[in-house]
Amino acid sequence: MGIRGLNYYIKKNTRNTLIKKTFADYRGEIIVIDASIYIYQFLMSKNYIENLFIMIRKFMKYKITPIFVFDGGIPTEKKVLIEERKRRKMKNKQEYEKLCIEYEKLIETTNTNNDIKIEKIKKLMNNKRKNSIKIKKKHIETIKNMFDVFGVQYLNADGEADILCAKIVKDGNACACLSE
């Protein structure tokens, strides 16, 4: 689940607690990754497989062993939040579709006064598209197939991935976790 604003709070209230590190600092180490965070980011760019491949190659370059952890079932305490997110995504998708129609109409007219409006609509469309992205079963299957081909390890959490990621690091089976 994560704690919203935790990094900001730590930075504001402590000194020298958060340290920036590079990939080279983790050479030869194992890192667990909350897969959904990066899948969402990569789906936003439309080239999710290519971006995931680039990420894996970067790990390989630095001889880092990544272990991707996929979310399992939704915890009871988060079901209301998930339903609210679904509603927001659906609303964003509908607004995106309306903007697409408006965009097409503006493109058809060759009025130069529309240029600013077109740019504004394109930005809104991009924002609405990003906020309507949903990880589908086919995305997960494609990614897992890619991991199998490249020998990348992955686990399926019973619940949320970040809980299993934290346990793996806490138990000393990985040195770090990539998450939000």
Provide a role label for each language-model segment.
Residues 2-17, 26-160, 164-168:
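Noncatalytic, basic helical substrate-engagement surface that gates or grips nucleic-acid strands
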Residues 23:
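Active-site and ligand/interface coordination hotspots across diverse enzymes
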Residues 165-180:
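Acidic, metal-binding active-site segment of PIN/NYN-like and related structure-specific nucleases
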